[in-house]
Amino acid sequence: MEIRAEEISEIIRKQIKEYGTEVAVAETGTIISIGDGIARIHGLDKAMAGELLEFPGGISGMVLNLEEDNVGAAILGEFSEIKEGDTVKRTGKIVEVPVGEALIGRVVNALGQPIDGKGPINTDKFGKVEVKAPGIVQRKSVHQPMQTGLKAIDSMVPIGRGQRELIIGDRQTGKTAVAIDTIINQKGGDVVCIYVAIGQKRSTVAQVVSKLQEHGAMDYTIIVAATASEPAPLQFISPYTGVTMGEYFRDSGKHALIIYDDLSKQAVAYRQLSLLLRRPPGREAYPGDVFYLHSRLLERACKVSDACGAGSLTALPIIETQAGDVSAYIPTNVISITDGQIYLESDLFYSGVRPAINVGLSVSRVGGSAQVKAMKQVAGTLRLSLAQYREMAAFAQFGSDLDKATQMQLARGERLVEILKQPQYKPVPNEKQVLIIFAANNGFIDDYPVSALRRYETELYTFFDTRKADVLADLRDKKAIDDDIKGKIVAALNEFKKEFTA
């Protein structure tokens, strides 16, 4: 067989022509040590702070420390398979998570990946986990109400859209209950809710999901879960994942509500990361930038100016205290960042006052300007009346000889405390809250025993729903009590008084 030179050269030419010239270039480094979700990597000289890294097995990591001869990275996922000497690639991207309408009704992990077994999330939109909060020019003062459906909050500690209101209290005082009721109360409205569970038991998260489904609230809610069994880096990043999803709605001119449950556990996870990264510890072994950890997160919740779409992102961070100590390190940090706090007290909770809000220590610094006018009219003196009642009740324990005025004030105070109680998962619309507080302030409930007031309230709502729906509609539309509406309410309450028997 004869081999001709032309044929050989033709074959070589053809192969050169068809040769693929694409060469994938990636900057890689080598793991020099790994443990507890932290890897030290040599060779990634050009890595950026917060950059996404690619570990073997498709696991992601995030650069946190940039040192002279190595970088410290948090591994965002299961790290048991990763070992010393493995190769790590740079991606050149900052950590991103999926955002958009497709996430509504889903349960996702701290990286935005679905964990509810309902298949993949179809979205092509992504948002950076760490972005700068809107500047002063892009903001507007809070002026629209964010109704929680809880009488004690909407009347005395009102929350506005774009506000950051802290919910603080010991364990088992109903902090999550307040947050879940607020989500349920947004049903039929235009608010998208995001619930971020940080370091909680999986059973607790499952319970929250089933309660929200039961009340039809998952139709407008996203749940981000970094449970107790997940590595510290995921617990640390989950609030930022949640707020990134919320910012998408805020910047689209919509309204969103985000709940962080709770930020104490995020601070603990961040402390663990920082100590493993050998950053110097400060007070209570927290790193020096633990204030910035929370401030940069909460500053991203705001009311945006009309020029930027007039959207809003309202934040309800939760902080757990130890034995009611509000002056500990993390609680004081978050109190100073937020626009007010709702303080829940275990003594009140165990004495049957639920929601267990301590009116004296709870405050809303900007919500007053967002409160519905009708509520402002009826609830203006409520806080003062309750404070006077508490003071009077303390004195009344010492002596039994009380004059008639004092006895009346004590009786009125007892009734006010009773009508502000509310069962869980039963938010009350604003116009009905106005009715019951109006009735209490104007002496319509003074003649009834305290034990009959729960029934009085239920029957009053039914009476107005069935026979005085026009009064409720007027209150809902006008959002204020003028002489005409006041006359109608008084007449209706007098009519109801004749029918109601204690």
From Swiss-Prot:
Keywords of the record: ATP synthesis, ATP-binding, Cell inner membrane, Cell membrane, CF(1), Hydrogen ion transport, Ion transport, Membrane, Nucleotide-binding, Translocase, Transport
GO cellular component: plasma membrane; proton-transporting ATP synthase complex
Gene3D superfamilies, A to Z: 2.40.30.20, ATP synthase alpha/beta chain, C-terminal domain, P-loop containing nucleotide triphosphate hydrolases
Keyword Hydrolase part of the UniProt annotation: no
GO molecular function, one term: ADP binding
Enzyme Commission number: 7.1.2.2
Signal peptide: none
Topology in membrane: Peripheral membrane protein
Class of this enzyme: translocase
Coiled coil (residue ranges): none
Residues engaged in binding ATP: 169-176
Pfam families on file: ATP-synt_ab (PF00006), ATP-synt_ab_C (PF00306), ATP-synt_ab_N (PF02874)
Subcellular location: Cell inner membrane
Function: Produces ATP from ADP in the presence of a proton gradient across the membrane. The alpha chain is a regulatory subunit.
Assigned protein family: Belongs to the ATPase alpha/beta chains family.
NCBIfam families in UniProt: atpA, PRK13343.1
Quaternary structure annotation from Swiss-Prot or TrEMBL: F-type ATPases have 2 components, CF(1) - the catalytic core - and CF(0) - the membrane proton channel. CF(1) has five subunits: alpha(3), beta(3), gamma(1), delta(1), epsilon(1). CF(0) has three main subunits: a(1), b(2) and c(9-12). The alpha and beta chains form an alternating ring which encloses part of the gamma chain. CF(1) is attached to CF(0) by a central stalk formed by the gamma and epsilon chains, while a peripheral stalk is formed by the delta and b chains.
Protein name: ATP synthase subunit alpha
Organism (species): Geotalea uraniireducens (strain Rf4) (Geobacter uraniireducens)
